[in-house]
Amino acid sequence: MIITKFESWWVERGKCLFDERRQGGAKMGWDVIVIRLTTDTGLEGHAVCMAARSGAVSESYLQESIAPVVLGRDPHDREAIFQELWVIDRHEAFFPVFLPGPVDVALWDLCAKEAGLPLYKYIGAYRDKLPVYASSNFLPTVQDYVDEALYYKSKGIKGYKAHPAGPVEFDMKVHAAVREAVGDDFILMTDPVGDYTLDEAIRVGRQLEKLNYKWFEEPFRDFELYKYSELCRALDI
């Protein structure tokens, strides 16, 4: 099985429930990229990802830098393809960090279809269902987060993850207000998208423990391992 066609489309997403912007920042334009890989057997692999501020720019990286690595390859060689993209990104192309992932998903999708299995069984099934939670984008006010969490709770969704827009004092107001609004029996999580210092993360983490948040996602960038080790020593969440 060989990949013979690499297609992508970018779609400007319609407005979400609420305006999306960092505090004091520009409006966030969350475009969507759709990827389709076609093989000589006729099988197709699909994936979708968000493309941050510009779907047009992301699609150009896909076609000019990533597609040449993928075309003509066996989708079973997905690990080799991923590692090649990782090297190219560092040495040559500098494409957005979120682009290799959906290509990898499309490769997995192809191989699962060839095997005649849903992907979760192809990779080794453990359960056949998972709970769903809603996830926010950056919202301008504390009340917007409260309203969004309550909206999703009213639809029967059991959890909500906030992406507070900063600074840290604003984020802590969001955490407290959302917990008060949804009650103690609703699952809450937060993700500041790598925006904290270590001291800020410890301060916020202690608040989250008191408010019974389920997890504290990405307070630092993924490569700041020392900070994560220190944070784990300081917190129980």
Residue ranges and their predicted role:
Residues 1-46, 50-51:
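Structured beta-strand/loop patches that form or line metal/cofactor-binding pockets in enzymes
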Residues 3, 42, 66, 103, ...:
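Conserved, mostly hydrophobic/aromatic
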Residues 38-114:
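Metal- or metallocofactor-binding catalytic centers and their adjacent structured scaffolds
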Residues 150-153, 209:
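Non-catalytic positions within long, well-ordered alpha-helices that form the structural scaffold/packing
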